[in-house]
Amino acid sequence: MSSVQSQQEQLSQSDPSPSPNSCSSFELIDMDAGSLYEPVSPHWFYCKIIDSKETWIPFNSEDSQQLEEAYSSGKGCNGRVVPTDGGRYDVHLGERMRYAVYWDELASEVRRCTWFYKGDKDNKYVPYSESFSQVLEETYMLAVTLDEWKKKLESPNREIIILHNPKLMVHYQPVAGSDDWGSTPTEQGRPRTVKRGVENISVDIHCGEPLQIDHLVFVVHGIGPACDLRFRSIVQCVNDFRSVSLNLLQTHFKKAQENQQIGRVEFLPVNWHSPLHSTGVDVDLQRITLPSINRLRHFTNDTILDVFFYNSPTYCQTIVDTVASEMNRIYTLFLQRNPDFKGGVSIAGHSLGSLILFDILTNQKDSLGDIDSEKDSLNIVMDQGDTPTLEEDLKKLQLSEFFDIFEKEKVDKEALALCTDRDLQEIGIPLGPRKKILNYFSTRKNSMGIKRPAPQPASGANIPKESEFCSSSNTRNGDYLDVGIGQVSVKYPRLIYKPEIFFAFGSPIGMFLTVRGLKRIDPNYRFPTCKGFFNIYHPFDPVAYRIEPMVVPGVEFEPMLIPHHKGRKRMHLELREGLTRMSMDLKNNLLGSLRMAWKSFTRAPYPALQASETPEETEAEPESTSEKPSDVNTEETSVAVKEEVLPINVGMLNGGQRIDYVLQEKPIESFNEYLFALQSHLCYWESEDTVLLVLKEIYQTQGIFLDQPLQ
């Protein structure tokens, strides 16, 4: 402020007796110079610690405008709270601090920025403090008004700023050990560039997010605190997922946006790793961890052991409680902050997070709250009391005449299931009926479905009841239910909403179900409260497993290929398929030619008289022979086309739709699938194809479709 005051004193101490023309000329100069000055437009920034460095990030244009309006109003500014970033953060204007709403995060400083200087090690500009920016602005105003430059200012940190002209302003750092009579600024190293106004620095400022929220998606992470190769948290990865979705809405749902049919989809992260490792288990593990290869052991304890924690009854209870309670808490808070929200809710899980959600969904109840009254809506395997009798089974097989024989021998269904072909022969059952009966009971025995949870006894102690079609070989006595897919016995919390769709990214659900002893998922099974289920994975993902072969074990078919977000297949995949088709065509044509040549070589010669009498037949025969391979190929092609067109029944787990969806690998990934295996498991957060599939399925439930269907 001393330089500003001295400048004002110079103005007041000017010559009191100017020439007659000097006053008017000064006024003219002042008017011309004053017209060049325009107040700077402020923009609001917040500070984030990234890689142990402070990074200043601009608010989007809408949020910055709201903050500026609240600041300019001056009414209760100290206690004013402004929601930003789509309502996920609150800015306390008086404190100049930004707080996360739905998750735990360190508060970040907020600043109203007008002047910037370039940082030391990168090209990013750093804003000056608000107070010093005001000093710079006042000095700049006087310099422009009086057209007097070379202004020198000293910051609170004894740093020197010199305003040479409107386009050249520099910042010098102080030299250690120098005093007021020390070296001049030009001797203090390389100067930094100073800029006025956010429009003069290179920074990306987004327009903002639509206010309307159409759908809410909770995203649950997998093992460890980091979710990608950059060791970012679930919050940062979901931020990327959300940003990709906003871009895709503008490019693939443009018509719906122009007609104001849609707003956006909100993705909120759910963190269970921190509560799990805050129980003190890390201290217990540290005591028994060997001192060698310390970093590797620490990584193992912090990530891979989460899989073992989930298979432990004690820590599994902590995990499912945390996930369910967090989703319920966030959902309640979301409704409080968005009272006009009328959209649906979906859930998504990555890696182990998808298995956690699968187990929670399997153990949900419908709105009636009575598991035993859900038979018609769930369509899952019934208990033993509802299974058909032996007489009904024989009637179904059209073998009712043999019921008297079984009744005479006191053979019920359980005994018949243990009978061999020889046993049935000894009691007088003919060969044909024996084969029918054995095949029927063998099929029933191998048809392993997910079992319904047993009803709770009146005493409150829940003892699971084994069903005839129970998939697990071991019976567990636990606090709550055993649904027959091998989970540890824990009490699964109830969600306060019904998810519409469950998305699994890079999911090991299929592997875990198989290891638990489940051989087959009943085609009629569906989640009690969730209608849709999509298993999305990268072809090189080492953690991902398919689900559809467990529903239809006897049929081999490929998963659904997720279209590229720009349409069609990737070029290298089309080239590969084209070369495969061409090689098959060449192979078929070559085999056909060799077959014709061999037949011509081995065929007996016709008599000359016969050849002369029937030349047309002689010419027609090789033609018909040459047509046979093409006919065969045509038939094979038509059969293949029919097989592709025919729908595949994959059960009701996804409402009759396909379950497994595979991404297209990138061209560079196809060179070495082992090299990109780990990256493939962590690619979903920034995958446009994955995000577009999620958006497409969500908006289809609302009757809104892509501008152009992808092929």
Curated annotation (Swiss-Prot):
Domain SAM: 385-448
Name of this chain's protein: Triacylglycerol hydrolase DDHD2
Protein localization: Cytoplasm, Cytosol; Endoplasmic reticulum-Golgi intermediate compartment; Golgi apparatus, cis-Golgi network
Annotated InterPro entries: DDHD_dom, SAM, SAM/pointed_sf, WWE_dom
Role summary: Diacylglycerol (DAG) and triacylglycerol (TAG) lipase required for proper lipid homeostasis in the central nervous system. It cooperates with PNPLA2/ATGL in neuronal TAG catabolism and hydrolyzes sn-1,3 DAG downstream of PNPLA2/ATGL. In vitro, it also acts as a phospholipase that hydrolyzes preferentially phosphatidic acids, including 1,2-dioleoyl-sn-phosphatidic acid, phosphatidylcholine and phosphatidylethanolamine.
Chain spans, region Disordered: 1-24, 449-470, 609-638
Reaction catalysis annotation: a triacylglycerol + H2O = a diacylglycerol + a fatty acid + H(+); a diacylglycerol + H2O = a monoacylglycerol + a fatty acid + H(+); a 1,3-diacylglycerol + H2O = a 1-acylglycerol + a fatty acid + H(+); a 1-acylglycerol + H2O = glycerol + a fatty acid + H(+)
